[in-house]
Amino acid sequence: MDLSLHVALCLGMLALCLAMPPKEKQVRWCAKSKSEFSKCRDLVNTCKNKEITLSCVEKSSTDECLTAIQNDRADAICVDGGDVYKGSLQPYNLKPIMAENYGSHTEPDTCYYAVAVVKKSSTFTFDELRDKRSCHTGIGKTAGWNVIIGLLLEKQLLKWEGPDTESLEKAVSKFFKASCVPGAKEPKLCQQCAGKKEHKCARSNNEPYYNYAGAFKCLQDDKGDVAFVKHSTVPEELHKDYELLCPDNTRKPISDYKNCNLAKVPAHSVLARARDDKSKDIIAFLQEAQKTKECKLFSSQHGKDLLFKDTAVSLVPLPPTIDGFLFLGAVYYQEIHALKEGVKEDDLAAPSKVRWCTQSKAEKTKCDDWTTISGGSIECTEAATAEDCILQILKGDADAVTLDGGYMYTAGQCGLVPVMGEYYDLDDLTPCQRRSSQAKGVYYAVAIAKKGTKVSWKNLRGVKTCHTAVGRTAGWNIPVGLITNETNNCDFASYVGESCAPGSDVKSNLCKLCIGDPAKPLDSAKKCSPSASEAYHGYSGAFRCLVEKGDVCFAKHTTVFENTDGKNPAAWAKDLKSDDYELLCPDGSRAPINDFKRCNLAEVPAHSVVTLPGKRKPVVEILVNQQSLYGRKGFQKDIFQMFQSKDGKDLLFKDSTQCLLEISEKTTMQEFLGDKYYTAVTSLNKCSNTKSGLLSSCTFHSC
């Protein structure tokens, strides 16, 4: 082909490509009934978006919609907590991306109350529900099934030995006289439903008694004696005719739902595929739709609670890291699981082992050694970071881990409790000799600099800083919190120069000094990781960063002593002298490194072992036993030592730990951390750019 013709053809094709409009973005909403599909078609016409088009996919049930989204034949649906649980599991693998807000635009409320509504003319109490006629929103739904059935089991009013004996539906059908539970397979649970032919007992609006309004209509029509719905279901003009049935066997007015409810539960949420980025388009479309006056997301001429609940005032985007488990919360998630799988005898028995979460290969190696000599009392799990360990414990995949105060704050916000604290004071070992002691381990957060440099606490602007990790106490929360308060500036990265703060955005200024794994320089995934795979992570890592690159290092008061004067044989540390380093004091002066009690940034709580509240007792008992064997004064300390690290520093526990002290069961995380430190971390986390993804997920709502 002639060269000029070839060039002309290429240029023509290029021009054609450039002239073609970009591919149109589309959000396909799944409607699970004809009335929902009609509302969806209305929204197509009224919720116009210049960049994103809405289309509607009609299915006959929530399950069909979940399958359609999984198979990329639809993109989104708004469901209740029970379906969030189902959608988050295999094979669907969906995640919540937005939540309905029932509060106001300025004070969002993404929770609601599950209640039991009865007619005022009736007289029975909660404990007298047996043999009553019941109206439910739908099988597997939060207010209409999961909460009430879970509560009946908990109060032992309903007997169920588990799915191996009989189905839960069968057990419930024996408890109530007759019911309407849309979606149920047990005939007696569909007896009171009003749908015609194939629509009778359908888990969609094709069944008149489906959902909140439907369950209440079932009660109104005298097809039931009680309806399990949400706190806002009963119209205000009908409050005079109905009451709430309280679990304490009293009754209260409909308006007193905060003092008479079955549970406070997470809002309905929008589900989307977890594996792709379609979530961005869905969120963008819905945010724009809420600004359009003609776009009526939360009402419809075609019926009640179609696509979204009518009581919602807006849709709130969820933190990107949130999944079904974190959205629902550990307690509710496990309750739903128990309703699906039953409670096994093994779940009720006291654990005979502690599954310890490790955060690096070196920790796993030490833990494996511990497992071998523990007689089965210790097992090990693997995680990449402290936050991954917190998540493992929440999900029941691990039992315990030792955390720094910063991560303890996050753990507490996620529902874990402190059970044993590290104790460091070599000068007073009396507390280690008692089973219970009021003593509490503390250490000091300090700023370390090389002797002879001009840097001080008062002139940190533009200096190179080294941190243990984002979210940790001495290396981040204390220094960054103090600097943020003093400068009234949340943008710490712009205040200092280059930094290594493992856990930061790898492209940011806060990761510039990080080096990853020196043994694998081409593995960019290791750089700035909040784990041992980043050489500058942790106390020793932050100090190494100071030695090799930085101007100031934020660590604990023993860090210099543990890495100088021959204490650390690593190549980078073996020739270092402690006299070559000084402490930076908050008043702008400097002090010798042994003057930490006077010259420090804060006295902070010791690292602590955390676990779930229900596992506190076995974790403490096993650790007390293991400490008596392998602690500093252990009978078998020659075989293994819990508080020493052969192949690294501070593995599983800090090497300076003298013993573990039991923390009183009544001690809250806030009390253990101390009000001053707790308040400092809370203030620091108001800076959105410093708040971790897990913390954002755990604190998104309080239900």
UniProtKB/Swiss-Prot annotation:
The reply to whether tRNA processing figures as a keyword in the UniProt entry is no
Describe, from its UniProt entry, the tissues in which this protein is expressed: Plasma.
| A GO CC annotation given for this chain | extracellular space
Which InterPro entries would you find in this protein's record? Transferrin, Transferrin-like_dom, Transferrin_Fe_BS
UniProt binding sites for Fe(3+) 2: 404, 443, 539, 607
A GO term for molecular function: metal ion binding
Q: Is the keyword Transmembrane helix in the record?
A: no
Signal peptide location: 1-19
SUPFAM superfamilies linked: Periplasmic binding protein-like II (SSF53850)
The subcellular localization recorded is: Secreted
A Pfam family of the record is: Transferrin
Quaternary assembly: Monomer.
To which protein family does this belong?
A: Belongs to the transferrin family.
Q: What does this protein do?
A: Transferrins are iron binding transport proteins which can bind two Fe(3+) ions in association with the binding of an anion, usually bicarbonate. It is responsible for the transport of iron from sites of absorption and heme degradation to those of storage and utilization. Serum transferrin may also have a further role in stimulating cell proliferation.
Its protein name is Serotransferrin
Q: What species is this protein from?
A: Xenopus tropicalis (Western clawed frog)
